[in-house]
Amino acid sequence: MAFHQFAPSSSLPIWSRVNNPFTPKTSIITSISKPKSKPKSNLKSRSKLRSRSRSSTCYPIQCIVIDNPSSTIINNSDRRSANYGPPIWSFDFVQSLPIQYKGESYTSRLNKLEKDVKRMLIGVENSLAQLELIDTIQRLGISYRFENEIISILKEKFTNNNNNPNPNYDLYATALQFRLLRQYGFEVPQEIFNNFKNHKTGEFKANISNDIMGALGLYEASFYGKKGESILDEARIFTTKCLKKYKLMSSSNNNNMTLISLLVNHALEMPLQWRITRSEAKWFIEEIYERKQDMNPTLLEFAKLDFNMVQSTYQEELKLLSRWWKDSKLGEKLPFVRDRLVECFLWQVGVRFEPQFSYFRIMDTKLYVLLTIIDDMHDIYGTLEELQLFTNALQRWDLKELDKLPDYMKSAFYFTYNFTNELAFDVLQEHGFVHIEYFKKLMVELCKHHLQEAKWFYSGYKPTLQEYVENGWLSVGGQVILMHAYFAFTNPVTKEALECLKDGHPNIVRHASIILRLADDLGTLSDEMKRGDVPKSIQCYMHDTGASEDEAREHIKYLISESWKEMNNEDGNINSFFSNEFVQVCQNLGRASQFIYQYGDGHASQNNLSKERVLGLIITPIPM
């Protein structure tokens, strides 16, 4: 695979554009000897839940155990408090969850249904009907079980039409095929939609507004557009107007919502490309597919059973994590930190939902806990002097620095050490590679950018939007999350990719992190301003331009849309040394961000909507 250099993003001018397993014992690894031969294991598909026991194979590890380190007391000035409430998902509640959909009888039934659906998918003779079935399977959340078959079908359709969608299709069929092909990395030209433009005016034909399914399909397809694809930009603007007009007319009828109306409202709220698979699957099963007259009972039963069985896997993982969290006593040692283990796990349902990735979800949840601790320490509790000391200690990776830290920071520092070393041990087993230096550098960079925001806050400095975003996409932790994901979903790892992740800030990581940062700002602004914080992107834009808050929010949404175009550029990019699987994780981080912060601060706040989302995706099965 060819390599290429990632240049700094050329989209910076848009910032100012007015338009649119920690254990209580602190065992710290200081060196790891590389094994002579690579152990045979599979990090990304390790689905057996572990209690952190290790195999009998041992590698030389030098450790330092510190009991009751000395503490230097730093003046305890009045500290800010976010007054985070206790978690609504208690340890006893999580441990009491019944694992309903486990066992041979469910597995046997699922396997039979899977074979039936596979025959159904392959046996469809009508080309459009086959595309519609693929779309339905995707929206039901079960396409991951038929990836090879779907790719084979789409590849055949692509090559049979000289690498273009079928020219004889109407708008609905053309948009559907375009979206599915783009989704799987096929280079489909946007010019196919010129067939639906008025050749005299160059605008989309007005009668498209009468074809709601066609307009809806074109709207969804437009969100697979890449930077500079003006036809798809025009399509999005045009179809948004069409769909909003239809929504207004439908709402005035005061009748029960039709399925088309539900689909239109759902799409206008957030397009398919930006939605997480599990949430979309639950909504589509319960609100759309069950109510369709042509619903296939086999397909519906399979989708429900798969959803519930995967949910049972999540419940097992969450039980393990809740025991880890309780045993760590971090909630007691760091009472100022958001105690949101279940919410940290909910992120993982958006990032990689498939049942075989249990290990990744467990470790990534612990990473989110670590990032939450560091975030709250910088944003809420730590003094500027303490935060500088913490960054220095992390940068030097020197235990002697701990004597300068207050006790609460020692706990945070030990957790960072232990978690980094646990990850390093697993990466060593999987890849025969010691990655501590890479992960450590990103953790130091993360804290430096957090420290910058703390300096802004204490000095009263108001950054420009460009200053804020250039610092904020690095302080939000996306690059740390995705470094972990790279090792989990890449084999073999390459030196070039690692150096790029560590130093080069690749475009896909940058823009996934920008979406994370900006979605966070949209959802948390009001709460963070109440407790006092550095100005967020919305306020920075208002200060830069004199815009109202509503105008600023629209501009931030526009920036998110522009970052999605940049990420779309990576789909099927043969010049990238990042795998399609890693690109998908980057995109899923963007999706999970928009899901968590869609209606407010879904990470910290525990309102009814946040509770319903946890219940729907992790706790309560879909009725069979």
UniProtKB/Swiss-Prot annotation:
Keyword tags: Chloroplast, Lyase, Magnesium, Metal-binding, Plastid, Transit peptide
Ranges where the record places region Disordered: 27-54
UniProt-listed Pfam families: Terpene_synth, Terpene_synth_C
InterPro entries: Isoprenoid_synthase_dom_sf, Terpene_cyclase-like_1_C, Terpene_cyclase_plant_C1, Terpene_synth_N, Terpene_synth_N_sf, Terpene_synthase-like, Terpene_synthase_metal-bd, Terpenoid_cyclase/PrenylTrfase
Source taxon at top rank: Eukaryota
Keyword S-adenosyl-L-methionine among record annotations: no
GO terms for biological process, alphabetical: diterpenoid biosynthetic process
Pathway: Secondary metabolite biosynthesis; terpenoid biosynthesis; Terpene metabolism; (4S)-limonene biosynthesis; (4S)-limonene from geranyl diphosphate: step 1/1
A GO molecular function held by the record: magnesium ion binding
Tissues with expression: Expressed in glandular trichomes two to four weeks after flowering onset.
Cofactor-binding details, from the entry: Binds 3 Mg(2+) or Mn(2+) ions per subunit.
Localisation per UniProt entry: Plastid, Chloroplast
Enzyme class: lyase
Motif (DDXXD motif) on chain: 375-379
Regions of compositional bias (Basic residues) in chain numbering: 35-53
Named cofactor requirement(s): Mg(2+); Mn(2+)
Positions of Mg(2+) 3 binding: D520, T524, E528
GO cellular component, one term: chloroplast
UniProt-annotated binding residues for (2E)-geranyl diphosphate: R338, D375, D379, R517, D520
PANTHER family tied to this protein: OS04G0344100 PROTEIN-RELATED, TERPENE SYNTHASE 10
Similarity section: Belongs to the terpene synthase family. Tpsb subfamily.
Name listed for the protein in its UniProt record: (-)-limonene synthase TPS1FN, chloroplastic
Source species: Cannabis sativa (Hemp)
